[in-house]
């Protein structure tokens, strides 16, 4: 029988308010969707259902309650397995489920004819996606529904009105958005708050110590609207590996799997991995991924990194990041390895005012 998350002494069990506009309480780490892969083992981590359930059990027993999915991930297997796990453990009221809509694998299953409306930000795509997600997740409601990305075709009014209807119906509780330009999210939230609609409460996007584009417009936008941030790729898609770990992988014939296929680390990834390993040693651990997670958590409040631990031991290492507090010198050192240009106009007239308001670590 699975234990109770609320009894856990782990820091993962110290639940926090999601954001200023969403008072739901969630764990400080999100168990990411890639972890449940079985259908797309050609380029992602392969995992059968039993192993996926063991991973979910470990996350919950350690105190975690925040789980991420998407309507199309792993040929829809992600939502199906999460739904089966929640039902088998009778945990629906304890788990916060986040899922996404815009793209559906039905487009590819059904062929190219008469399938255009399976994708996009429009009302029909949203209706079909949520209908199917509720069925696969075996639930009556979705805690957080993300717009997966902006399709550059639908109007802001159409998709914000359509999302608000789902909230009114009780099928969705909170709204999120991912991988979408800051100007679109700003316009959408302005429209929502101006006309009595439900605004976005959380933003999910790519961010890590090596790729810091998130800091240009996304973080300031989230601050302005009181949104939470859920960065993905925090661990560099598995490419932040110490020299020792890479040697062990080569010895075992393991490559680095990612969306671009198996390959070696780039020079920048090697440099940042060595820097992470150096800081890890200072904090009494060998885990570079724990330091990578601790780095993004140190930048601001209301950050909920998504972790993709394919193995239980990896997940446990990731959870240890919650006990690591990086010093200002640690952060300064990591950010010096691969310099980041915040870009115009932030590196021109407004840089000094941003530094004064938020501090150098947050600019």
UniProtKB/Swiss-Prot annotation:
The top of its lineage is:
Eukaryota, Fungi, Dikarya, Ascomycota, Saccharomycotina
EC number(s) per entry: 1.1.1.-
GO MF term (any one) = aryl-alcohol dehydrogenase (NADP+) activity
Q: Where are the transmembrane segments?
A: none
Q: Name one GO biological process term.
A: aldehyde metabolic process
Keyword Oxidoreductase listed? The answer is yes
Q: What is this protein called?
A: Putative aryl-alcohol dehydrogenase AAD3
Q: Which UniProt keyword terms apply here?
A: Oxidoreductase
The organism of origin for this protein: Saccharomyces cerevisiae (strain ATCC 204508 / S288c) (Baker's yeast)
Query: Into which family does the record put it?
Result: Belongs to the aldo/keto reductase family. Aldo/keto reductase 2 subfamily.
InterPro entries named among the record's database cross-references: AKR_Detox_Biosynth, NADP_OxRdtase_dom, NADP_OxRdtase_dom_sf
């Amino acid at each position: 029988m699975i234990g109770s998350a609320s009894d856990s002494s782990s820091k993962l069990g110290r639940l926090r308010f999601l954001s200023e506009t969403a008072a739901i309480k969630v764990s400080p780490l999100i168990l990411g969707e890639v972890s449940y892969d079985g259908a797309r083992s050609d380029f992602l981590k392969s995992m059968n259902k039993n192993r996926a359930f063991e991973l979910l059990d470990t996350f919950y027993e350690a105190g975690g309650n925040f789980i991420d999915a998407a309507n199309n991930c792993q040929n829809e297997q992600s939502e199906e397995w999460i739904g089966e796990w929640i039902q088998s453990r009778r945990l629906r009221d304890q788990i916060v489920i986040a899922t996404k809509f815009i793209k559906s694998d039905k487009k590819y299953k059904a062929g190219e004819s008469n399938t255009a409306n399976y994708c996009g930000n429009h009302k029909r795509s949203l209706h079909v996606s949520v209908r199917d997600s509720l069925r696969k997740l075996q639930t009556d409601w979705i805690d957080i529904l993300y717009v997966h990305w902006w399709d550059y075709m639908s109007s802001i009014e159409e998709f914000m009105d359509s999302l608000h209807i789902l909230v009114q119906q009780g099928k969705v509780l909170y709204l999120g958005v991912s991988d979408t330009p800051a100007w679109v999210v700003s316009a959408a939230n302005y429209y929502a708050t101006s006309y009595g609609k439900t605004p976005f409460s959380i933003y999910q996007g790519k961010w890590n110590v090596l790729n810091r584009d998130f800091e240009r417009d996304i973080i300031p936008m989230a601050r302005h609207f009181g949104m939470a941030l859920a960065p993905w790729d925090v661990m560099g898609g598995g490419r932040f590996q110490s020299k020792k770990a890479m040697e062990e992988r080569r010895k075992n014939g393991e490559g680095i799997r990612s969306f671009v296929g198996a390959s070696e680390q780039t020079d920048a990834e090697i440099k940042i991995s060595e820097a992470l390993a150096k800081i890890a040693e200072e904090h009494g651990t060998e885990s570079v991924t724990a330091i990578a997670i601790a780095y993004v958590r140190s930048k601001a409040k209301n950050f909920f990194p998504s972790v993709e631990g394919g193995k239980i031991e990896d997940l446990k290492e990731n959870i240890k990041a919650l006990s690591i507090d990086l010093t200002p010198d640690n952060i300064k050192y990591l950010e010096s390895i691969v310099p980041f240009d915040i870009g115009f106009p932030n590196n021109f007239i407004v840089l000094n005012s941003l530094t004064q308001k938020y501090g150098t670590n947050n600019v």
